[in-house]
Curated annotation (Swiss-Prot):
Disruption phenotype: Severe bleaching phenotype concomitant with negligible levels of chlorophylls and glycolipids. The levels of alanine, glycine, tryptophan, and arginine, as well as those for glycerophospholipids were highly impacted in the mutant under anaerobic conditions. The gene is TER. It comes from Euglena gracilis. Euglena gracilis exhibits the metabolic behavior of a plant in the light and of an animal in the dark. One of its GO terms (molecular function) is NADP binding. This is Trans-2-enoyl-CoA reductase. Transmembrane segments: none annotated. GO terms for cellular component: mitochondrion. It is an enzyme of class 1 (oxidoreductase). Residues 1-68 form a transit peptide. GO terms for biological process: fatty acid biosynthetic process. Its main location: mitochondrion.
Length: 539
């Protein structure tokens, strides 16, 4: 049967069909064989049409059970005369009403089409839609997604781009396998982005470790894309399961005691114990579980106003920035959020639950950087928090018998580093220098080198500096690298920014955080934003 040429014709056709069926029902009464095929017990073409139109886009449970489907067919066969003798008149009235409604709608559309034919046709589906229940076959979450940047935040994410980026890191970890034994059951607190994600990938695909991750990221909602961390975690779990590796992720606030309890239960049930605990949290605020007080971190110097140059990444402009010093309360709050207290609480919870394996290690990520960034970083509020992390490492080692190491990593483009004044300009210059020298590393390169050469080296003992830190910022802090960056710092301006720095590389890396700018992804094609977390079924 050909489709009606227009919405109006469709309405008329439907009304006429309903009217004809009603007439036949009334005429046949107790002889419904006129509606069935005499030589079969199957539904007629009309019923098969209903089956094709309704059963396929919905589940069988939504309409009838599969056991009831044969009964429906029998109801339309010539042998069910007693049922149809009563059903004919009952069906006729609703069908006549439906036919009348359809003809009335056609008449309304025809009148409006005299004045506004295009508008009438556009409004007709809306007028009809509210009369019928919504059908899943007409909904979709596929859309074209392009980056939308506001300051140092990208408000959109691309599911396929995020997945491809995770796959790239997995490929790198597999291509650089360890040469000595390493962790086998790993807990990563903050597993969905940055160093946490790359550490998890290295542990799983380098050491074949079972990994349990804790993260906080919003899933897709009402057709809106999820956070990048959600898509990253989904992609990681899929790849791990395909490789036959245990991978489970808990979505929750790492600062919350309930999340710690859920994690302990998951370890007890699935892993027994863990031999490496990775703490990789960067957050703007934290509620103290003991007091219920909300603390907010800030990025400010201490003691005096700090003025230096930075880059406006939206406009590609080098400008001066002045930052007022933090108050004592702001310093204390920043330490409360970004210091070592929560790391310590995690190890306490794991130790008291008996889920730390003998010889287990724990690491927390930190940064020191060059002196030009110290006023706003190492000597500022965030630096006070990082120094507290080092104090916590000593307490953890002494109190719980679990060796704890602050890991000082390289400056990289992350959502956190993008928010720190001065640092983005430093990174643009640093990338230029290190790429020219062939020593540039991203997150995955850093974490592969951390685990294979620093934390689990061939001699077995972690390699630390005089303060007990594991350093993977050693290539960044090399004297020749820092001197070259200083020379460029004194020259850089808006006019030459793109010539003497790797500003283009900075922008590319920033977009990649959200799944954009990935080779092999067609960003002009619609993509489904829905993505289920494989391990969610276990929770």
């Amino acid at each position: 049967m050909s489709c009606p040429a227009s919405p109006s014709a469709a309405v008329v056709s439907a009304g006429a069909l309903c009217l004809c069926v009603a007439t036949v029902l009334l005429a046949t009464g107790s002889n419904p064989t006129a509606l069935s095929t005499a030589s079969t017990r199957s539904p007629t073409s009309l019923v098969r049409g209903v089956d094709r139109g309704l059963m396929r886009p919905t589940t069988a449970a939504a309409l009838t059970t599969m056991r009831e489907v044969p009964q429906m067919a029998e109801g339309f066969s010539g042998e069910a005369t007693s049922a149809w003798a009563a059903a004919g008149p009952q069906w006729a009235a609703p069908l006549v009403a439906a036919a009348s409604s359809a003809l009335a709608l056609w008449w309304w559309a025809a009148r409006r089409s005299v004045r506004r034919p295009l508008a009438a046709l556009a409004e007709l589906p809306t007028a009809v839609t509210h009369l019928a229940p919504p059908m899943a076959m007409f909904t979709t979450t596929a859309k074209v997604i392009q980056p939308k940047i506001r300051g140092f935040i990208c408000t959109t994410t691309h599911p396929i781009g995020c997945e491809k980026r995770v796959q790239e890191e997995i490929a790198y970890a597999r291509a650089h396998p360890p040469t000595s034994p390493g962790p086998k059951r790993v807990l990563v607190i903050g597993c969905s982005t940055g160093y946490g994600l790359s550490t998890r990938i290295t542990a799983a695909f380098g050491y074949q470790a079972a990994t349990l991750g804790v993260f906080l990221a919003g899933p897709p909602t009402k057709g809106r894309p999820a956070a990048a961390g959600w898509y990253n975690t989904v992609a990681f779990e899929k790849a791990a399961l395909e490789a036959g590796l245990y991978a489970r992720s808990l979505n929750g606030d790492a600062f919350d005691s309930t999340t710690k309890a859920r994690t302990v239960e998951a370890i007890k049930r699935d892993l027994g114990t863990v031999d490496l605990v990775v703490y990789s949290i960067a957050a703007p605020k934290r509620t103290d579980p003991a007091t219920g007080v909300l603390h907010k971190a800030c990025l400010k110097p201490i003691g005096a106003t700090y003025t230096n140059r930075t880059v406006n990444t939206d406009k590609a402009e080098v400008t001066d920035v002045s930052i007022e010093p933090a108050s004592p309360e702001e310093i204390a709050d920043t330490v409360k959020v970004m210091g070592g207290e929560d790391w310590e609480l995690w190890i306490q919870a794991l130790s008291e639950a008996g889920v730390l394996a003998e010889g287990a290690k724990t690491v927390a990520y930190s940064y020191i950087g060059p002196e030009m960034t110290w006023p706003v970083y190492w000597s500022g509020t965030i630096g006070e928090a990082k120094k507290d992390v080092e104090k916590a490492a000593k307490r953890i080692t002494q109190q719980y018998g679990c060796p704890a190491y602050p890991v000082v990593a390289k400056a990289l483009v992350t959502q956190a580093s993008s928010a720190i004044p001065v640092v983005p300009l430093y990174i643009c210059l640093l990338y230029r220098v290190m790429k020219e020298k062939g020593t540039h590393e991203g997150c995955i390169e850093q974490m592969v080198r951390l685990l294979t050469t620093k934390l689990y080296p061939e001699n077995g003992a972690p390699i630390v500096d005089e303060a007990g830190r594991v350093r993977v910022d050693d290539w960044e802090m090399a004297e020749d690298v820092q001197q070259a960056v200083k020379d460029l710092w004194s020259q850089v301006s808006t006019a030459n920014l793109k010539d003497i720095s790797d500003f283009a590389g900075y922008q590319t890396e920033f977009l990649r955080l959200f799944g954009f700018g990935i080779d092999g992804v067609d960003y002009d094609q619609p993509v489904d934003v829905e993505a289920d977390l494989p391990s969610a079924a276990q929770q």
